[in-house]
From Swiss-Prot:
GO terms for molecular function: proton-transporting ATP synthase activity, rotational mechanism. Belongs to the ATPase delta chain family. It holds the Pfam family OSCP. F-type ATPases have 2 components, F(1) - the catalytic core - and F(0) - the membrane proton channel. F(1) has five subunits: alpha(3), beta(3), gamma(1), delta(1), epsilon(1). CF(0) has four main subunits: a(1), b(1), b'(1) and c(10-14). The alpha and beta chains form an alternating ring which encloses part of the gamma chain. F(1) is attached to F(0) by a central stalk formed by the gamma and epsilon chains, while a peripheral stalk is formed by the delta, b and b' chains. GO terms for cellular component: plasma membrane-derived thylakoid membrane; proton-transporting ATP synthase complex. It comes from the Bacteria. InterPro entries: ATP_synth_OSCP/delta_N_sf (IPR026015), ATPase_OSCP/d_CS (IPR020781), ATPase_OSCP/dsu (IPR000711). It comes from Synechococcus sp. (strain PCC 6716). This is ATP synthase subunit delta.
Amino acid sequence: MQTTIRGELVEPYAEALLSLAQSHNLADQFQQDSGLILDLLAASAELQEFLANPLINPDAKKNVLRQLTVDKVHGYFLNFLMLLVDRRRINLLAAICQQYRALLRKLRNIVLAEVISAVELTEQQRHAVVEKVKTMTGAADVELAIAIDPELLGGVVIKVGSQIFDASLRGQLRRLSVSLAQPV
């Protein structure tokens, strides 16, 4: 139930941010700005706790956000952050930024492909993954989110929405062990 309520709060703010971005031709700028915010939040658990703490004065939160984003985000985006503080919704900031990016991808017919690889992918391998995902989904473009997991032993696992394409050595070994365990 908490997730549903949170989703109902996040969606309107993300849609409002997208509407603002489109009306001022700032969709790409806001995508960069939201990426910066997501990076800041991911890098600092203290910042997350600070912004989520209802006992901390809203002006203190605004000052910290201004200091962190001065000359790094567009003024309209900064105003949006201040609005979230005023409305006591700043604790939803990461979810709103993620939803904004998802709405923008949907609008532009871009899919997000989460790629897990045993080693760092070369540019040629990245291109091959993008083309494979385009073929699988019919999307105009693909945004890659790449993670490294040495336990895969080799190959990649690609997740697009609810679809998973497992071309890893670990996955092949698992499928082989399952088939060998089947009675003849």
